[in-house]
Curated annotation (Swiss-Prot):
PANTHER family: FATTY-ACID AND RETINOL-BINDING PROTEIN 1 (PTHR31418), FATTY-ACID AND RETINOL-BINDING PROTEIN 1-RELATED (PTHR31418:SF19). The keyword Chaperone does not apply. Its main location: secreted. It is found in: Secreted. It comes from Caenorhabditis elegans. This is Fatty-acid and retinol-binding protein 2. Disulfide bonds: none annotated. Residues 46-73, 131-152 form a coiled coil. The gene is far-2. Probably binds lipids. Belongs to the fatty-acid and retinol-binding protein (FARBP) family. It comes from the Eukaryota. Residues 1-17 form the signal peptide. GO terms for cellular component: extracellular region.
């Protein structure tokens, strides 16, 4: 599931085509306005990643095309960095527990997004890259589905994944979405 969340996060960045000045190398480099959106348990996992584990993760990311399934990726992670594999397993368990607390309609939307993310990832690995227009349409559809959720469903997302709510409610992000997703 962690890989699926990473795929969704990376796809979101690609979809919105927002210029990113620099990817933070350390948790402390993340702007304070975004740190507050990261659940404490996730923040602790991020802070606990060592320089060696970051290097292993970077190498695995560079070789992402070699891993056709989540299981292959996990096996490579375990071989490359057993300590990072253990940390990733704990984070995956945490995210799974949070996912299970979501309202059923929120779960359905998240499952749909994850499934599409996996599908896009497989297409990418096969050399079939989606067009920016198709990604824009996909993003617009998911944004509309999120907005159509009940207040209760949105409340469970806010409680369990505040970073997602922050993403959908942040004025700067809404401006970017308005600019790039038309």
């Amino acid at each position: 599931m962690i890989r699926a969340f990473l795929v969704v996060a990376l796809a979101s960045v690609a979809v919105f085509s927002a210029p990113i000045p620099e990817v933070p190398q350390n948790f402390d480099d993340i702007p304070a306005e975004y740190k507050g959106l990261i659940p404490a348990e996730v923040a602790e996992h991020l802070k606990a990643i060592t320089a060696e584990e970051k290097a292993a993760l970077k190498e695995l990311a560079q070789n992402h095309k070699e891993y056709k399934t989540e299981e292959e990726f996990k096996a490579a992670l375990k071989e490359k960095s057993p300590s990072l594999y253990e940390k990733a397993g704990k984070l995956e368990a945490l995210l799974t527990a949070k996912f299970e607390k979501l309202d059923a309609t929120a779960q359905a939307l998240v499952k749909k997004i994850i499934a599409k993310g996996r599908e896009l990832h497989q297409q990418y690995l096969a050399g079939d890259k989606p067009t920016l227009d198709s990604l824009k349409e996909l993003a617009k559809g998911y944004i509309a589905e999120y907005k159509a959720l009940s207040d209760d469903a949105k409340a469970t997302i806010t409680a369990e994944f505040p970073i997602l709510t922050g993403f959908f409610q942040n004025e700067k992000i809404q401006a970017i979405v308005g600019q790039y997703v038309n």
